[in-house]
């Protein structure tokens, strides 16, 4: 006898007639007049539950099996047999079943058989992974994570763990969470009446990071190809389906690379990850196609078979101005493209993923390399049909004098970036990288539109439960 996951049984890894033990939770119980109960038991290893056929000859049939309800946990041992019913190849002829945990009151169990709205499930984040939709999201999220790590490993990248606590504002936007151990009821003050951060834990102001990029750049300038994959934080008071206060970012940095190099890297990474999901998680994708967004499978297959289009920002603005479409936000050179502009370019004009390059410097961050025209920077966004921007990146400014000029233009203090400036003083090198918002990627793959539903415990304005 061996411990088996539901997925391993369905994959045929256990011979017909072999005895296995499956451990999981009851989704449904159905009783027949012939004295047999049919239990649908899931363990999270795949989308479908396995059917356990339980005879009334078991000693605990009357006093336990017939009392099982949705959510009860069981340890079920039996023989693997071919299933006569449609929908699954194998089932379990149960010879022994142990109840590991009961549901106290089945009538009030929040995850009972009735369907809940996805909005309601957010209020039950500790129980929602038991539902079909959130369980499927979790498996797809894991598949994408593993594929991204695998991709960078195969490409010779080194994974760098960048700090979550920082004194630098990577984006220069100031929307950062402060980290402090000072007594909020009795703050120390300077003679000028300002908060005295010399008395704080780090002896200075500290924040939760908005990006691991600046730290990753230092490692790229020694190890050539690195990436970060971890949580980042934005204190942006946005209550929308596209914003979280805590989210995960994938950020590669490559030495001796330019904008075209990382555009190619972004394309290769996305196609690798999408192919992994199409290969490994078709059961979950089929569910999403049936119940969430019927286009998800076709969209991913189309994405991996499409060549990325490329267009300069200036040309993209001209396309949008001359397309005959009236947009909610009018288009003019110098504005940041909105979601409706991005989706028009990807879905209607190019009908493919598109890389928009060379944005106006005034709407981009200080670290992006200034182009020879003095007006634009070597920045790029990858726009995907169905969602818009999915990746943002740039060639980094490797020239110290130009970097200092950009810091001054954006009213940022050189002293706060002394270590970042050092990289331009000691063997500077052209380098480039990008950031991928991981939750936005999961949303794109699953068709689940609100990114609060593709992260286990969402953090947003006035939302920090669990």
UniProtKB/Swiss-Prot annotation:
It catalyses: tRNA(Asn) + L-asparagine + ATP = L-asparaginyl-tRNA(Asn) + AMP + diphosphate + H(+). Its main location: cytoplasm. Belongs to the class-II aminoacyl-tRNA synthetase family. Homodimer. This is Asparagine--tRNA ligase. Coiled coil: none annotated. Keywords: Aminoacyl-tRNA synthetase, ATP-binding, Cytoplasm, Ligase, Nucleotide-binding, Protein biosynthesis. One of its GO terms (biological process) is asparaginyl-tRNA aminoacylation. GO terms for cellular component: cytoplasm. Disulfide bonds: none annotated. It is an enzyme of class 6 (ligase). The keyword Protein biosynthesis applies. It comes from the Bacteria.
């Amino acid at each position: 006898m061996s411990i088996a996951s539901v997925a391993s049984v369905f994959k045929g890894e256990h011979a017909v007639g072999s005895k296995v033990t499956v451990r999981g939770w009851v989704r449904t119980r159905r009783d027949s007049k012939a004295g047999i109960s049919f239990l649908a038991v899931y363990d999270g290893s795949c989308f479908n539950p396995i059917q356990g056929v339980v005879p009334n000859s078991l000693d605990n049939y009357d006093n336990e099996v017939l009392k099982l309800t949705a959510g009860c946990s069981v340890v079920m041992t039996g023989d693997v047999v071919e299933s006569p019913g449609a929908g699954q190849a194998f089932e379990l002829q149960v010879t022994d079943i142990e109840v590991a945990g009961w549901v106290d009151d089945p009538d009030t169990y929040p995850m009972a058989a009735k369907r809940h709205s996805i909005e309601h499930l957010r209020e039950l984040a500790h129980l929602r992974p038991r539902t079909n939709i959130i369980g499927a999201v979790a498996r797809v999220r894991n598949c994408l994570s593993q594929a991204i790590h695998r991709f960078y490993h195969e490409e010779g990248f080194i994974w760098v763990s960048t700090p979550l606590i920082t004194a630098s504002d990577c984006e220069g936007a100031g929307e950062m969470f402060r980290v402090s151990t000072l007594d909020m009821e009795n703050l120390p003050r300077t003679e000028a009446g300002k908060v005295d951060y010399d008395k704080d834990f780090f002896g200075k102001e500290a924040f939760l990071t908005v990006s691991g990029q600046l730290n990753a750049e230092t490692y790229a300038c020694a190890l050539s190809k690195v990436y970060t994959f971890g949580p980042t934080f934005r204190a942006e008071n946005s209550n929308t389906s596209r914003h979280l206060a805590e989210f995960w970012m994938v950020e590669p940095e490559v030495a001796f690379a330019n904008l075209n190099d990382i555009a190619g890297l972004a394309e290769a990474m996305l196609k690798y990850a999408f192919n992994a999901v199409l290969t490994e998680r078709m059961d979950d994708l089929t569910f999403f196609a049936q119940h969430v967004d019927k286009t998800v499978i076709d969209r991913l297959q189309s994405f991996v078979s499409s060549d990325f289009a490329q267009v300069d920002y200036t040309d993209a603005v001209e396309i949008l101005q001359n397309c005959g479409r009236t947009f909610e936000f009018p288009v003019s050179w110098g504005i940041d493209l909105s979601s409706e502009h991005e989706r028009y370019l990807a879905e209607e004009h190019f009908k493919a993923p598109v890389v928009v390059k060379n944005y106006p410097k005034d709407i981009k961050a200080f670290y992006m390399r200034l182009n020879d025209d003095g007006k634009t920077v070597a920045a790029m966004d990858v726009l995907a049909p169905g969602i818009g921007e999915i990746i943002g990146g740039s060639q980094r400014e490797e020239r110290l004098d130009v970097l200092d000029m950009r810091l001054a233009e954006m009213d940022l203090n050189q002293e706060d970036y002394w270590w970042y400036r050092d990289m331009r003083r000691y063997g500077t090198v052209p380098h480039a990288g990008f950031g991928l918002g991981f939750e936005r990627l999961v949303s794109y793959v699953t068709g689940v539109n609100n990114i609060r539903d593709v992260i286990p415990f969402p953090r947003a304005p006035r939302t920090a439960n669990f």
